[in-house]
C-alpha cells in the first residue's frame, strides 16, 4: 500500500496503518482501503453518469443544483411577470393583450416555473431562440389544457384521474392520458375540445417569456447572427456563470457521494459523534446520528453516553460472512424464468403483455379496456424491474464478499437512538437478505443450543404463534423434510412455501449439520427473539397495564397471546351486533350535491362477515397504533392490505370499498380502546404535553422542542420546525419547493444576480407535527434504549455476535439461553428503575410558563402489572 493513499483516510500516519496491519493482516487492511476508494469513485461516476443522462433526456431540472437555481429564480421572474401583466392591463390593446389573455388562467408563479425549467433543460448549449421559445409555449399550452380538463371534475373523479395520471411514467403517456380524458368529457358535452394554438402562438408566448427571464434574472442572453443570405438568426444561451455553477455544484455533490458497502476489517469504533465507521475521509462524513451536522454537534458533542457507544460498537464489530450455501441456491434461482412469488425475487424476464383484441380497431370501449390493461401491465413490470434491481444489488454484494472470512456492517443511529446499518446487504434486510449472511464467529451449540436452533426453524416456517414445545416438536417430527431440503433445495422446493423461505432454507442446512455432528456443532446461524407488538409492550410496562400487558405477552402463560387475533375477535363481535341491529342503506348527497348510496352498517357488516376478519385484517392497524396511526390511517391500511386484494379475486366482495374501509377502521379503533387502554392514554398525554411545549415560548420568544433522555443515556430532541417554503406543482414540470412569494414592498432590480442558498428552518415549531410525531418517536426511543442496554449486558456476559433489528434480538444459538434471559431482565430493569413518563412530565413542567403549566395534565394512572412476571414469560420476546 502506498502511504500517499493514506492521506485520504482517517489513519494517523504510518504507525496506525502498521498497527492495523499487525492486528488484521496487511492484505485485509489494503483490501479495505482499496474497497473504500473504489466505493467513492463508483459513487462519483454513477452520479455524473446520471447527470449526463439527464442532459441527454432533457430532464436536468430534476438534478439538485438545477432545482436550487429554479427555486431561487421563480420569485424573481414571478414579480417581473406580475409587473408585465399590470402594464398590459393599463396599456393599449395589441399583440401582448392577446398573449396575456391566452396564459392568464395560470398564476405568475406557475408560468415562471414552467418557463425557467424549460429554459434550463433546453439551453445547456447555444440553441435556436425559436426552438427554446416553442418548447416553452408548448409546455404552457399543455398546462392550460390540463387545467381545463381537471376543472370539470368533482373531488371523486379528480382523485381517480390523478391516480391514473400517477401511474403513467413518461410525459408522453401522461399527455395522451389527458387527451383521452378530454375526448371523453367532450363526448359527454362537459367541455369543448381544446383549440390548439399553433406554433406561431407558441413561439410568440415563448419569446416573451424568454425576454422576461433574461431581463429579470440576468441568467441568460441572446446572440444575433447574420447569415450569408442576410437572414438574421437569434440564439439563446444561459450565462456561462450559470453553466459553470450547475456543473460545479453537481460535481461537488458527486464528490460527496459514497457507496456504503460492507467492510473487511472491523469499522472504526465510534468515540465521538463524528469519528467512527469507515476509514476514509469524506467531505460529508458519516455521523453517529443522522441529522444536520451542526445539530449533531450541539446535541451530542459534549454528552457522556458510554452505553450508547458500547452498544453501537458491539453491533458493528460483529463479524459476519456470506452464507455460501444459500448464495449458491440464490444464484441459481435468480436465473429461473418463473420464480415462486414468496421468494421476493422477481424474474428477469417480463411477463407477456396483454394482446390487443382485433375489435379494438372499431370498438372504442374495447380499445380503452386494452389501454387500461396495458397501463397495469407497465406498472407491474416497473415494480418487477425495481425489485429485481434491488435483488441484483444484494446478490452482487454477496458474490463480491463470498470469499472473505469476515465482513462487517458499519452502523449509526437516527435521532431517536434506533440503530441502523449503513449498507444494503445487512442483518436488517428482508428475509432474502438476512439469509445470505451468517455469523463468522460460530459458537458450539452445547447442551441447549439445539433447542434454540429448532425454535428459529419453526418460527421461520410460520409457527411463531404456537406454544414453544409444539414448535420444537414440529422440527423433530419434520426432520425428514428438512434433510431432504438441505440435500437438494433446487429439487425439493417445500422451503419456498414457508413464511420466511430463505431463512428457513438457511436453517435446514444448519439443522442437517447439527444432526450430523451433535451438540459440539459450531453454529453460525443467528437466532432471533422478537418482541410481541413492541410499542404496546413498552407502553404497557411503563404504565403497569395488566390488560394490555397480557395481550402482548408480558405475563406468563402456557400459550401465545396474539393481540392481532384478540382485536380481530372483538371486531367480529361488533360486526355481529351491526348485522343484527345496524343501520340501513340510504341515499345521501356529496359535498358537491351529487346523490350516492351510503351503505348502512348492517350491509357492510354482512360483507365483512362473509369475507371474514382474521388477524391479517387487524395486524397493521394494531401494530401502528402506538406509532401515531389514526382511524384515517387504519382505513388506508385496510384498503391496501385487505379490500383491494379481495376485489382482485372477487370484484363483488365489497360494493363500496372506501366506505367499507372506513367502517372497518372505526371498528378496529373501537376494539383497541378496550384492549390497550393505557397505551391510548399514554399517547394522548404525550400529544398534549408536546403540544403545550410547542405553543409556549422561552425567554427569547422561541417555541420549545420536546426533549428527553432515554434510560440508555441517549438524548432525544423532537424539533419539527416550520419551514418558510411552499410547494409549487404543475402538470408539465412537476413539483418544486419555493420560498414564499415576495411581499409587495420587496425590491428586486431587473438583472439582479441570483445566489442559490440552502433553505433554513424557522425557529417556530410546528405544533401539529410535534403532536403527531411524539408518540411514535417516544416509544421508538424506548425500544432503542432497551436494545442498547440489552447489548451492553450481553457483552458483559461474553456475547460477541449480534443481529439486532429494533425489537428483534439476535445471537448465536449457543448463546440463546443468555439472550433469552437478558432481554427480559433489561426490559424489567428499565421500567422498574425508571419512571420514564413521570420524569418527562417533571422535565416539561419545569420548562413551561406559568400560564401553560396549569394545562399540563398528570400522567395516566398506573395499573397493577407486576413487571417481575416478564422474566417468567416465555412469549414476551419469542
What is each stretch, according to the model?
Residues 780-784, 788-794:
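C-terminal substrate/ligand-recognition segments
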Residues 417, 787, 807:
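Short, conserved catalytic/metal-binding motifs centered on acidic residues
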Residues 773-782, 810-811:
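Short, contiguous acidic/charged loop-to-helix segments that flank catalytic cores in large enzymes
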Residues 1-619, 628-777, 793, 797, ...:
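Non-catalytic nucleic-acid-binding interfaces of large nucleic-acid enzymes and RNP effectors
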Residues 622-624, 640, 806-812:
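Conserved short loop/turn motifs at secondary-structure junctions
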Amino acid at each position: 500500500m502506498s502511504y500517499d493513499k493514506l492521506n485520504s483516510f482517517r489513519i494517523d500516519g504510518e504507525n496506525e496503518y502498521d498497527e492495523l496491519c499487525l492486528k488484521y493482516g496487511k492484505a485485509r487492511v489494503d483490501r479495505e482501503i482499496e474497497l473504500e476508494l473504489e466505493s467513492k469513485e463508483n459513487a462519483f461516476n454513477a452520479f455524473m453518469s446520471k447527470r449526463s443522462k439527464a442532459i441527454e433526456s432533457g430532464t436536468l431540472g430534476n438534478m439538485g443544483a438545477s432545482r436550487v437555481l429554479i427555486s431561487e429564480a421563480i420569485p424573481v421572474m414571478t414579480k417581473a411577470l406580475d409587473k408585465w401583466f399590470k402594464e398590459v392591463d393599463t396599456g393599449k390593446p395589441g399583440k401582448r393583450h392577446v398573449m396575456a389573455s391566452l396564459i392568464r388562467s395560470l398564476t405568475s408563479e406557475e408560468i415562471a416555473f414552467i418557463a425557467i425549467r424549460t429554459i434550463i433543460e433546453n439551453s445547456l448549449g447555444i440553441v435556436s431562440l425559436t426552438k427554446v421559445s416553442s418548447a416553452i409555449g408548448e409546455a404552457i399550452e399543455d398546462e392550460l389544457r390540463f387545467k381545463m380538463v381537471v376543472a370539470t371534475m368533482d373531488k371523486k373523479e379528480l382523485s381517480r384521474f390523478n391516480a391514473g395520471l400517477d401511474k403513467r411514467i413518461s410525459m408522453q403517456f401522461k399527455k395522451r392520458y389527458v387527451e383521452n380524458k378530454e375526448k371523453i368529457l367532450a363526448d359527454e358535452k362537459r367541455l369543448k375540445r381544446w383549440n390548439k394554438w399553433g406554433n406561431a402562438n407558441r413561439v410568440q408566448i415563448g419569446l416573451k417569456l424568454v425576454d422576461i427571464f433574461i431581463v429579470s434574472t440576468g441568467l441568460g442572453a441572446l446572440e444575433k447572427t447574420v447569415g450569408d443570405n442576410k437572414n438574421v438568426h437569434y440564439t439563446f444561451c444561459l450565462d456561462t456563470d450559470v453553466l459553470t455553477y450547475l456543473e460545479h455544484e453537481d460535481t461537488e455533490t458527486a464528490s460527496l457521494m459514497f457507496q456504503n458497502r460492507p467492510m473487511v476489517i472491523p469499522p472504526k469504533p465510534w468515540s465521538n459523534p463524528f469519528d467512527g465507521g469507515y476509514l476514509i475521509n469524506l467531505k460529508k462524513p458519516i455521523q453517529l446520528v443522522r441529522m444536520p451536522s451542526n445539530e449533531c454537534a450541539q446535541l451530542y458533542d459534549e454528552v457522556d453516553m458510554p452505553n450508547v457507544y458500547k452498544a453501537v460498537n458491539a453491533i458493528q464489530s460483529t463479524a459476519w460472512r456470506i452464507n455460501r450455501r444459500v448464495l449458491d441456491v440464490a444464484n441459481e434461482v435468480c436465473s429461473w424464468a418463473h420464480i415462486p412469488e414468496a421468494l421476493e425475487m422477481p424474474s428477469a424476464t417480463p411477463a407477456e403483455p396483454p394482446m390487443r383484441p382485433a375489435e379494438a380497431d372499431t370498438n372504442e370501449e374495447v380499445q380503452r379496456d386494452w389501454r387500461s390493461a396495458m397501463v397495469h401491465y407497465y406498472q407491474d413490470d416497473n415494480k418487477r424491474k425495481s425489485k429485481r434491481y434491488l435483488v441484483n444489488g444484494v446478490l452482487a454484494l454477496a458474490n463480491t464478499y463470498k470469499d472473505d472470512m469476515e465482513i462487517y456492517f458499519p452502523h449509526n443511529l437516527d435521532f431517536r437512538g434506533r440503530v441502523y446499518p449503513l449498507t444494503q446487504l445487512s442483518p436488517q434486510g428482508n428475509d432474502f437478505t438476512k439469509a445470505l449472511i451468517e455469523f463468522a464467529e460460530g459458537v458450539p451449540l452445547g447442551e441447549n443450543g439445539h433447542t434454540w436452533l429448532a425454535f428459529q426453524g419453526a418460527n421461520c416456517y410460520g409457527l411463531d404463534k404456537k406454544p414453544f414445545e409444539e414448535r420444537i416438536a414440529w422440527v423433530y417430527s419434520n426432520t425428514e423434510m428438512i434433510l431432504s431440503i438441505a440435500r437438494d433445495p433446487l429439487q425439493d422446493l417445500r422451503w419456498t412455501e414457508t413464511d420466511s423461505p430463505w431463512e428457513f432454507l438457511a436453517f435446514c442446512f444448519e439443522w442437517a449439520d447439527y444432526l450430523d455432528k451433535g451438540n459440539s456443532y459450531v453454529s453460525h446461524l443467528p437466532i432471533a427473539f422478537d418482541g410481541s407488538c413492541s410499542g404496546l409492550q413498552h407502553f404497557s410496562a411503563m404504565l403497569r397495564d395488566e390488560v394490555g400487558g397480557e395481550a402482548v405477552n408480558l405475563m406468563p402463560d402456557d400459550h401465545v397471546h396474539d393481540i392481532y387475533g384478540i382485536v380481530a375477535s372483538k371486531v367480529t363481535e361488533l360486526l355481529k351486533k351491526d348485522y343484527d341491529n345496524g343501520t340501513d342503506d340510504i341515499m345521501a348527497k356529496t359535498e358537491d350535491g351529487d346523490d350516492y348510496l351510503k351503505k348502512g352498517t348492517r350491509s357492510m357488516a354482512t360483507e365483512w362477515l362473509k369475507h371474514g376478519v382474521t388477524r391479517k385484517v387487524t395486524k397493521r392497524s394494531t401494530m401502528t397504533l402506538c406509532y401515531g396511526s389514526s382511524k384515517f390511517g387504519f382505513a388506508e391500511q385496510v384498503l391496501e392490505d385487505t379490500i383491494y386484494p379481495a376485489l382482485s379475486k372477487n370484484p363483488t366482495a365489497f360494493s363500496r370499498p372506501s366506505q367499507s374501509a372506513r367502517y372497518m377502521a372505526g371498528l378496529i379503533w373501537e376494539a383497541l380502546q378496550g384492549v390497550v387502554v393505557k397505551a391510548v392514554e399514554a399517547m394522548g398525554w404525550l400529544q398534549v404535553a408536546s403540544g403545550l411545549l410547542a405553543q409556549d415560548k422561552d425567554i427569547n420568544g422561541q417555541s420549545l422542542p420536546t426533549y428527553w433522555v432515554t434510560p440508555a443515556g441517549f438524548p432525544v430532541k423532537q424539533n419539527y420546525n416550520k419551514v418558510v417554503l411552499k410547494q409549487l406543482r404543475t402538470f408539465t414540470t412537476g413539483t418544486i419547493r419555493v420560498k414564499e412569494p415576495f411581499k409587495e414592498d420587496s425590491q428586486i432590480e431587473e438583472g439582479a444576480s441570483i445566489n442559490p442558498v440552502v433553505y433554513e428552518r424557522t425557529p417556530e415549531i410546528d405544533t401539529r407535527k410535534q403532536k403527531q410525531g411524539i408518540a411514535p418517536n417516544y416509544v421508538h426511543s424506548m425500544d432503542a434504549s432497551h436494545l442498547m442496554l440489552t447489548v451492553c449486558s450481553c457483552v458483559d456476559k461474553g456475547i460477541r455476535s449480534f443481529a439486532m433489528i429494533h425489537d428483534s434480538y439476535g445471537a448465536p444459538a449457543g448463546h440463546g439461553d443468555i439472550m433469552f434471559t437478558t432481554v427480559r431482565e433489561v426490559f424489567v430493569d428499565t421500567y422498574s428503575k425508571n419512571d420514564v413518563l413521570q420524569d418527562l412530565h417533571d422535565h416539561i413542567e419545569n420548562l413551561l410558563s406559568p400560564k401553560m403549566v396549569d394545562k399540563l395534565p398528570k400522567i395516566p394512572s398506573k395499573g397493577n402489572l407486576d413487571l417481575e412476571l416478564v422474566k417468567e414469560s416465555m412469549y414476551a420476546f419469542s
